[in-house]
Amino acid sequence: LLVRPDITFRLFQFLNCQEIDISFLKNMPHMKRLRIDCIDFKSNTNRINLSVLAELSLKSLHMECFDLIDYEFIQNLSDELEELFIMADTMGAGIRFDCTWLLKYKNLHTLWLGKKAKKNLEKINQLPKLKSLSLRGIKLTDFSFLWKMNLEKLALLWNSNSNLNELANLKSLKEIELWRINKLSDISFISELTNLEIIKLQDLKHVTSLPDLSRHPNLQRVFLIDTGINVKELPNYLQEKVSNWDNR
């Protein structure tokens, strides 16, 4: 890890362990990227001593743990944090998480939030370096808080939005991903995002056509995965950019 700080150290499953002691991570000073996933907290809400994370010099943290309720440890991570992934999936009513906790991380450039990590979501527009935002299961009725940001990537996943026209104001976007937005049929706003390089549409059965993309000089790839769009009906300049799987 000293030689390859880009490598992610992963902790997962521990199916037969009622309690998991991760204090050994303090003996790995060169670890910068950590992923903790496939661990269920339903039977024991204190299954892992997550307070240990405050003693690590993490630049990237990926948390995908079912029924994890208390995320207060997020407030005490390293000031070096650049990437944060929080699945926030539970069977219960809610979690302890607040987006205002993230404002101390001035170097945060990539943020992925799951459906219950949405309290004070609009405050993330105060993160000066945030470039990539992914929201899963979070339905927004007002996107205007995003207009103040210079986002380069936006991903909206698993929500019930039917009108995304406000996204036309995000002129700095280079990549947009829309995935399993069941009520969505109109994506005409994409024609206004002329800096786009990547468009990814997945599991959008009601989306049957692409808008005019002839004013998108930087467009490189268009991923169309399980949509209602007939690729053969697209203009030739688009057909050559289309792929039905994301191989990046």
Language-model segments: residues:
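Concave beta-strand-loop units of leucine-rich repeat
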Residues: L1-I20, F24, H30-L103, N107-T141, ...
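Serine-hydrolase catalytic core
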Residues: I190
